Amino acid sequence: MSSKQATSPFACTVDGEETMTQDLTSREKEEGSDQHPASHLPLHPIMHNKPHSEELPTLVSTIQQDADWDSVLSSQQRMESENNKLCSLYSFRNTSTSPHKPDEGSREREIMNSVTFGTPERRKGSLADVVDTLKQKKLEEMTRTEQEDSSCMEKLLSKDWKEKMERLNTSELLGEIKGTPESLAEKERQLSTMITQLISLREQLLAAHDEQKKLAASQIEKQRQQMDLARQQQEQIARQQQQLLQQQHKINLLQQQIQVQGHMPPLMIPIFPHDQRTLAAAAAAQQGFLFPPGITYKPGDNYPVQFIPSTMAAAAASGLSPLQLQKGHVSHPQINPRLKGISDRLGRNLDPYEHGGGHSYNHKQIEQLYAAQLASMQVSPGAKMPSTPQPPNSAGAVSPTGIKNEKRGTSPVTQVKDETTAQPLNLSSRPKTAEPVKSPTSPTQSLFPASKTSPVNLPNKSSIPSPIGGSLGRGSSLDILSSLNSPALFGDQDTVMKAIQEARKMREQIQREQQQQPHGVDGKLSSMNSMGLSNCRNEKERTRFENLGPQLTGKSSEDGKLGPGVIDLTRPEDAEGSKAMNGSAAKLQQYYCWPTGGATVAEARVYRDARGRASSEPHIKRPMNAFMVWAKDERRKILQAFPDMHNSNISKILGSRWKSMSNQEKQPYYEEQARLSKIHLEKYPNYKYKPRPKRTCIVDGKKLRIGEYKQLMRSRRQEMRQFFTVGQQPQIPITTGTGVVYPGAITMATTTPSPQMTSDCSSTSASPEPSLPVIQSTYGMKMDGASLAGNDMINGEDEMEAYDDYEDDPKSDYSSENEAPEPVSAN
């Protein structure tokens, strides 16, 4: 049983079947080798073995038989697929482990043969051999196809190429094929050239595009810049128009001021005001000064001027002409004791060289003068005065060289505590003691910034006039004055010009006298101290005159005077010297106080410390700053164009111009400032600027700044104007050193408060309130711009004033641009 199971199913076949299978295999081999002999042969041996005439037709016929060849290949592929199926089935049956029955094996072989060949003869062959044979044939065909390139080319040729090949021979075809690489290289070179040209063209286009972009961007930038420039120009034009409008407004204001001043009497200023007689003559000529008709004038006599008592110190300090009263003789003990004391002091303080007959005081004349002065108080400041007879002057024959001594002798500052004390005082020297001096004769005082100048290092000018030879040329000037008694000479220009010419002549005479007698000026130089003019250029000379007296005489101060650290601002010398300090009469700011009345009221004082410089140490000037350098020429130009323009207005114009200038325009002046500073540093290596002390005013125990104090004074002045507007009477004109007639008040000293009314020009006022302001120096107090010398000060104005001092005043300091203005100076 086991042997039967182990045998294969093919072992059971008979010998006949085995023989048939072998025969079938051999026949298939023969058929396979004989069926398609031509199809398996290569084409080129056939083509080359034949002659050229038969070569092309054979090739064409072979190509035409491709369809048959394709059908054969497709049939072979179908057979191969069927054989693969049979092989897989056969391998499956062979791998089976179970024995097969003979009938089953025969049945399977029949199925296989029927599926594969469909004929009984092919059932006997070996399917494996058939499959191997077909695979080998296919591989041989593929190998021959790859080796024969020409046959592949022939298959791929189109009909056009076939026709061309029919017309051409093989050599021409081969030659054309051989020339192809050269043509390809040529074409490649042409293509590369075209590519290069295209690349360059593209680069050019890109460059042109970039240039266009840049050009457009530059045009846009230019347009933007032009728009910005146009906008800036418009803004600049707008600013310039605004500045022009502001300047036009300022010009209109100046024109209004000029028009307002035009309604006032014309200001005729003597060119050489060194002699008080000609000064008084010119001032009287321009103002139509009417002398009392009761007083006669003779060519050789002194012309009388109204008696100015000691109570007029404030009015005199505000610009009253320092006329000197001739020595008079008081012989009326029955009059008011206060008036008698005034007359006694007046007589004792007159110059010893002035003697001669004059009118004597009588009680009636003194009372008339006192009544006239009280009447003048009640007249409003701006009221125009009619020409009324003046009572005969009880002061006697008054000469213009005596009133200065009267003012010196009766000034509130220089009075001794005792009312009856009468001794000659040298008022041109600085006071020494700090004790307040009581003055029962002065209800009003004027406080001014003190003069910057000091007697130290003052040059000894030999050209300073002296009124020693007072009688020289007096007759001609008195003739002019006597001719002015008529009201018909108002505004007579010829008379004024004659007075000016006489002033020049007398100036020359006084200069000759000064050269002949240079040391005989004791007690006379103080009369020159207060010769103030409204023109700021001439006020520097007055500053030099103030301190020349103590320098030449060498006299010390009397007992009872103030110390050197305290400056009395009620003295006319100090008041007018303060004008020269600022370089402008408009800068003269006046401060007032009101005593309670009686003989125990103390004077108001300005207490200041010295700069820390010894009296023997020379004063070193400060170098000019950029503004002062620039304004030096500008101020002269303005003065040439407008000689009558006030210094304050010029300073405002210059300050406005300086502020409107650009830094580039200011640059050369800053360079000049640096150069001057360098020279100054080389000249004075140890120089150290010592600023002035600040000032405050104490009123009713309160510390006020100068601006607040001035505002308070204005309000009180307005109250007093309203209080004294009733019962106006004609007032007595007062001729000042500046040639301006102040219709202000002349008050006699009384035990009750006697307020004084003055004009707006002098700014002198009074108040019955018992307030006692004291101006003292405070270093810690910083002053603002509103409390300085001017109410409406602008930047650069103080620098201009400092420049004025620099030009003419040897004792002045020079402020810089970044420095706060300091209108007060110490000794």
From Swiss-Prot:
Transmembrane segments: none annotated. It comes from Rattus norvegicus (Rat). This is Transcription factor SOX-6. The modification Phosphothreonine is found at residues 119, 401. PANTHER family: FI18025P1 (PTHR45789), TRANSCRIPTION FACTOR SOX-6 (PTHR45789:SF1). InterPro entries: HMG_box_dom (IPR009071), HMG_box_dom_sf (IPR036910), SOX/SOX-like_TF (IPR051356). Sumoylation inhibits the transcriptional activity. SUPFAM superfamilies: HMG-box. Homodimer. Interacts with DAZAP2. May interact with CENPK. One of its GO terms (molecular function) is DNA-binding transcription repressor activity, RNA polymerase II-specific. Residues 795-808 have a biased composition (Acidic residues). The keyword Iron does not apply. There is a cross-link at residues 404, 417 (Glycyl lysine isopeptide (Lys-Gly) (interchain with G-Cter in SUMO)). It holds the Pfam family HMG_box. The modification Phosphoserine is found at residues 399, 439, 442. Transcription factor that plays a key role in several developmental processes, including neurogenesis, chondrocytes differentiation and cartilage formation. Specifically binds the 5'-AACAAT-3' DNA motif present in enhancers and super-enhancers and promotes expression of genes important for chondrogenesis. Required for overt chondrogenesis when condensed prechondrocytes differentiate into early stage chondrocytes: SOX5 and SOX6 cooperatively bind with SOX9 on active enhancers and super-enhancers associated with cartilage-specific genes, and thereby potentiate SOX9's ability to transactivate. Its main location: nucleus. GO terms for cellular component: cytoplasm; nucleus. Residues 1-51, 329-360, 380-470, 752-772, 786-827 are annotated as: Disordered. GO terms for biological process: astrocyte differentiation; brain development; cardiac muscle cell differentiation; cartilage condensation; cartilage development; cell fate commitment; cell morphogenesis; cellular response to transforming growth factor beta stimulus. Residues 184-257 form a coiled coil. It is found in: Nucleus; Cytoplasm.
